[in-house]
């Protein structure tokens, strides 16, 4: 009998207490996580490097630390804007992705993950992200990165989100059809596609995303949210006067993540599932929430 859980829980390294990358990897393992998400900017800050420091020696060092902690990298994050209209900026961003794709292979072949950009050089959250032209720009930039991923045998995973260019399940499907690369996959964060006007339709949006894009989902993000009555900060707003504030999975009870775990049990058991927006005081509870969901959904699926 296959006893793989429905999901394999992980944590974002920068949601753990302050420390070096090595210290945070050990923290993740001590908490019971077996997967981490490692943003390149966190690695750069800890090591005092830029992309030129992504060497075989560093990869060997990190692999030793990861192995000792019983942890592996689910996603190496690279969040440079692929929809920028600034050509010089775009070329530099391409170089960043190439460096991260190469380093991911040195680490053992983990995917490189990214968000879906905005069509302005400031990467500002604005209505221009909703246009067809924005989607064109992102798809063009993504196609270039996918070519590089294919060349090195790597993977690039995009994470759709309301604050970015790929902000609905249908726009995600369109990108997947236009950039038909075997190296392209999706990180699915259900809460990232929500905003105040649609929170009551959250499960319907989730079902549509799984239907349209489920075959390309390679990793999950797990978080919860609350709605607050102001739009004082950019992001998670939609002109209603409210915005979403994100928390770790299970912290507020506003988003029911269990249907996603049930989908995973049937479609891709053991898929990495990274907790987002936890804080040091809540990380252990978020892990317990995911473990309980994974056990319930995995057992239910095995009984079918």
Q: What are these model-predicted stretches?
A:
Residues 3-11, 35, 139-251, 296-304:
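Acidic/histidine-rich catalytic cores of soluble enzymes
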Residues 9-16, 39-43, 78-81, 117-119, ...:
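Active-site beta-loop-alpha junctions enriched in small/polar residues
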Residues 17-28, 92-101, 199-210:
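Short, acidic/polar
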Residues 21-42, 107-108:
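Catalytic domains of carbohydrate-active enzymes, especially glycoside hydrolases
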Residues 23-26, 60-61, 65-69, 83-188:
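Active-site acidic/histidine proton-transfer and metal-coordination neighborhood
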Residues 34, 72, 110, 218, ...:
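Short acidic/polar active-site loop segments enriched in Thr and Asp
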Residues 37-63, 116-122:
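Glycine-rich, proline-tolerant flexible connector loops at the mouths of alpha/beta enzymes
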Residues 283-303:
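C-terminal helical cap(s) of enzyme catalytic domains, especially alpha/beta-barrels
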């Amino acid at each position: 009998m296959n006893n793989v859980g429905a999901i394999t829980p992980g944590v974002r390294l920068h949601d753990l207490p302050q420390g070096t990358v090595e210290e945070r990897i050990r923290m993740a393992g001590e908490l019971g996580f077996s997967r981490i998400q490692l943003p390149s900017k966190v690695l750069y800050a800890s090591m005092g490097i830029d992309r030129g420091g992504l060497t075989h020696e560093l990869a060997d060092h990190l692999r030793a630390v990861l192995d000792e902690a019983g942890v592996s990298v689910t996603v190496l994050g690279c969040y440079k804007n692929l929809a920028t209209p600034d050509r010089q900026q775009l070329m530099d961003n391409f170089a960043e992705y190439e460096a991260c794709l190469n380093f991911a292979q040195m680490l053992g072949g983990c995917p490189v993950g990214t968000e879906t950009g905005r069509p302005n050089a400031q990467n500002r959250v604005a209505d221009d992200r909703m246009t067809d032209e924005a989607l064109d720009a992102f798809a063009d930039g993504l196609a270039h990165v996918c070519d590089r991923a294919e060349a090195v045998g790597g993977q690039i995973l995009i994470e759709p989100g309301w604050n970015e260019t790929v902000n609905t399940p249908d726009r995600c499907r369109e990108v997947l059809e236009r950039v038909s690369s075997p190296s392209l996959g999706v990180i699915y964060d259900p809460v990232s596609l929500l905003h105040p006007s649609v929170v009551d339709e959250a499960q319907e949006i989730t079902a549509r995303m799984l239907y349209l894009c489920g075959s390309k989902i390679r990793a999950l993000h797990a978080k919860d949210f609350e709605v607050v009555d102001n739009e004082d900060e950019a992001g998670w707003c939609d002109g209603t006067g409210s915005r979403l504030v994100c928390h770790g999975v299970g912290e507020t009870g506003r988003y029911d993540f269990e249907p996603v775990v049930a989908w995973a049990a049937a479609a891709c058991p053991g898929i990495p599932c990274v907790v987002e927006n936890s804080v040091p005081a809540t990380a252990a509870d978020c892990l317990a929430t995911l473990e309980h969901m994974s056990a319930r959904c995995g057992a239910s699926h095995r009984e079918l």
